[in-house]
Amino acid sequence: SPGRLEAPSPFLSMFDAHVVGQVIRSDEGFSLERLVLPLKAKDGRIGAWCVAMPFLRPSDVPRIEDATEPYAEGIEALYRQAIEHAKAKREAGQALIALGHCHLTGGKASEDSERRIVIGGAEALSAEMFDDSVTYVALGHLHLSQEIGGDSTRRYSGSPLPLSFSEIDYPHQVVIVDFDGEVLSRISEHKVPQSVELLRVPSSPATLDVVLAALSDLDLPERHEAEWPYLQVRVHLTEPEPSLRVQIEAALQGKPVRLARIETSYVRG
């Protein structure tokens, strides 16, 4: 919840870390000041301004009269207000960065990880709401690392860890962005080591006899139990198989692996 996200703010502020979990509004309008934060260099100088926009619920956004998509258009309007507020603070040589927890048009979602964000009749927002004054847009929600529209300055860094078996082949990383004044000088990707492996056996669903043979042939190195891989087993069935788990566990007997999920799909026999 927004309140839970902001609960540790007093502690985190001691380390110059800031959490913005919700939008505050009053009769006078939105509190744009809390959405626009200075980013300081080691010497204390402000090097950039950040539009720290949290996930926006329908009740968080401005009401747009005669809007075709009230929620999406409200989000875009609030971003425009916050960006203009940041531009008013920005001085020469300072970059402008925007954050967003949203699904932009053209972004690729995982098979079974992200919650679907439905914005009125549309599911995605246009990247055009970030105009050329915004030097870099750091996006969250989609777990696959990706650029939007082929623009390296509008991107999802992706999840640093796999959050489902569908993300096994994703590049899990942290993206570091360097600026020279207001100019983006370098974007570097740093892979996150994976301490526990995820396995899919087989890589594509197969019949039960093929799956059991593959599990029996599974050759894994011995390691501490806390480092055993998590395993997803993928089986094609023609009818329900009551002893499916028993057969799979028997094939895995004595192997250093943790059975996390059995995925079944049905085909006509």
Regions found by a protein language model. Name each.
Residues 91, 128-133, 225, 253:
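Short, conserved loop/helix-junction motifs that constitute active-site signature segments
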